[in-house]
């Protein structure tokens, strides 16, 4: 299944706020109410919607998400929490959380177009897994700095999570540590997602 490129507002009306996908918000609380609100949802439907929230927020294909699920399943600790850590430490997500890009798709474009350095080297892979002490900067070109400055100026200025530090004047972000799952900026039940994929993890 490919990455979603359809109407974004349609998704947030059904699933709720997805800040990684779009910075738009429903105009009223009723916009978050699914038309099937009064129909009792099956457990499968509930797990499916949680999985879709995660996939659309981080901009992943079905295959990519399943790959992360399998990696998390082999790691020590809670599979759901490890999954969130893996996704949050992606370079495109780090740029988004720093405010250097307004959405994760926008961050992915910055990386693909080689506007971003990690530890002084160009990285053009959005899924690059950042690690503690990584330093993320704009390439020393006017176009790169302008793109990131525009995003920083337009950013809603949400609190930078504790595992990151932002230097506005140097267009620089620092990864202080692996993210604690409590700092994930998305209302999600990761355990339902693990349950959704439980059979596929075992295959």
UniProtKB/Swiss-Prot annotation:
InterPro entries: Ribosomal_uS4, Ribosomal_uS4_bac-type, Ribosomal_uS4_CS, Ribosomal_uS4_N, S4_RNA-bd, S4_RNA-bd_sf. Disulfide bonds: none annotated. The keyword RNA-binding applies. It holds the Pfam family Ribosomal_S4. GO terms for biological process: ribosomal small subunit biogenesis; translation. One of its GO terms (cellular component) is plastid. GO terms for molecular function: rRNA binding; structural constituent of ribosome. Keywords: Plastid, Ribonucleoprotein, Ribosomal protein, RNA-binding, rRNA-binding. SUPFAM superfamilies: Alpha-L RNA-binding motif (SSF55174). The keyword Cell membrane does not apply. PROSITE patterns: RIBOSOMAL_S4 (PS00632), S4 (PS50889). Residues 89-152 form the S4 RNA-binding domain. It is found in: Plastid. HAMAP family: Ribosomal_uS4_B (MF_01306_B). Belongs to the universal ribosomal protein uS4 family. One of the primary rRNA binding proteins, it binds directly to 16S rRNA where it nucleates assembly of the body of the 30S subunit. With S5 and S12 plays an important role in translational accuracy. Part of the 30S ribosomal subunit. Contacts protein S5. The interaction surface between S4 and S5 is involved in control of translational fidelity. This is Small ribosomal subunit protein uS4c. It comes from Orobanche minor. The lineage of its organism: Eukaryota, Viridiplantae, Streptophyta, Embryophyta, Tracheophyta.
């Amino acid at each position: 299944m490919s990455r979603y490129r359809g109407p974004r507002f349609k998704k947030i009306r059904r699933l709720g706020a997805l800040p990684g996908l779009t910075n738009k918000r429903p105009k009223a609380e009723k916009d978050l109410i699914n038309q099937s609100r009064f129909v009792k949802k099956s457990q499968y439907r509930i797990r499916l919607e949680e999985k879709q929230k995660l996939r659309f927020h981080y901009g992943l294909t079905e295959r990519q998400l399943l790959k992360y699920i399998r990696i998390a399943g082999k790691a020590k600790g809670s599979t759901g929490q490890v999954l969130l850590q893996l996704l949050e430490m992606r370079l495109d997500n780090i740029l988004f959380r720093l405010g250097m890009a307004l959405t994760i798709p926008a961050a992915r474009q910055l990386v693909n177009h080689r506007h971003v350095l990690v530890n002084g080297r160009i990285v053009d892979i959005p899924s690059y897994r950042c690690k503690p002490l990584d330093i993320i900067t704009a390439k020393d070109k006017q176009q790169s700095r302008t793109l990131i400055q525009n995003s920083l100026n337009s950013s809603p200025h949400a609190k930078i999570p504790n595992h990151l530090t932002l230097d506005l004047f140097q267009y620089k972000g620092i990864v202080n540590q692996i993210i604690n799952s409590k700092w994930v900026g998305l209302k999600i039940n990761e355990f339902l997602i693990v349950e959704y994929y439980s059979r596929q993890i075992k295959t």
